[in-house]
Swiss-Prot record:
Catalytic activity, as annotated: urea + 2 H2O + H(+) = hydrogencarbonate + 2 NH4(+)
GO BP terms in the entry: urea catabolic process
Protein name: Urease subunit gamma
Pfam families in the record: Urease_gamma
Gene that this sequence comes from: ureA
Location(s), subcellular: Cytoplasm
S-S bridge residues: none
Keywords on record: Cytoplasm, Hydrolase
EC number: 3.5.1.5
InterPro entries membership: Urease_gamma (IPR012010), Urease_gamma/gamma-beta_su (IPR002026), Urease_gamma_sf (IPR036463), Urease_subunit (IPR050069)
Keyword Cytoplasm assigned: yes
Main location: cytoplasm
């Protein structure tokens, strides 16, 4: 299987997102990389499903709460930016204060 560097990055992010999802389901508090991966994956999947940029900006802020992450992690992530593939092309989605 030949993947472009961009496809490899997306696959790595998706794998990290799955790991974070499993840890969250076990009741474990997520660290910084896990939180970013989970939020990013949610945005990428929503975009792939055909949701709008505005919907994904809103949804990205509903993935995690402060109770879901380790102490101090929410403050470490002032925003998350991810390039997601929408039906009409690739767009940059920015979520400010994603962990509320």
């Amino acid at each position: 299987m030949d993947l472009t560097p961009r496809e490899k990055d997306k696959l790595l992010l998706f794998t990290a997102g799955l790991l974070a999802e499993r840890r969250k389901a076990k009741g474990l508090k997520l660290n910084h990389p896990e939180a970013v991966a989970l939020i990013s994956c949610a945005i990428m999947e929503g975009a792939r499903e055909g949701r709008s940029v505005a919907e994904m900006m809103d949804a990205g802020g509903q993935v995690l709460t402060r109770e879901d992450v380790m102490e101090g992690v929410a403050e470490m992530i002032p925003e998350v930016q991810v390039e997601a593939t929408f039906p009409d092309g690739v767009k940059l989605v920015t979520v400010h204060e994603p962990i509320r």
